[in-house]
Amino acid sequence: RRDEHGFLIGKEKDWVYIDWADMDKDGPLCAEQMLYAACFRVMAEISKQLGKDGNVYRQEYEKLTAAIEKFFWDEEKGAYIDSFTSGKRNVTRHANIFAILFDIADKQKQEKILTNVLENDEIPAITTPYFNFFELDVLCQMGKLTEVLDKIRSYWGGMLDLGAVTFWEEYDPSVPKEEQSAMYGDPSGKTGCHASAASPV
């Protein structure tokens, strides 16, 4: 379902998963809209490669990205917010990473995101190897190769330092070693070998 702005909206009991993160999911979720916009752009490119007219997809992409800019960009924070309906104006890394990864943010906004989000320790860190991959990708695009190598050594290396022989579904370095296996309300609920966790290998 879409609302009057073209944003995807869920039903009351829908589960919207972007990552295991504390996002403000009141109303349309910014990261989800960015994924949706990226789909339109890809469909336009596929149409072009097939010799078809992909104009309808390009138009949807333009309309959706314009709405994203209007409702989710917060100039004061220099970042995209999770939700505009709750009034919280909460910033997480996820939508801002997608904004750079999918080239939704212009170069000026990308630099603001780098400073205000990606290099800002006050913005909660990503705790899944799966989504850390996207952050590393964006940092590489922005020329932060030393930081990327440091992150691989500290994050994936941190799991190895704790005795991991495979990479976990989730790893939060701030959690005590004896609690690292806990997830889903189960003291041993975390997947100890997760395919999406192996991205730098």
Residue ranges and their predicted role:
Residues 1-201:
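Active-site core of glycosidic bond-cleaving carbohydrate-active enzymes
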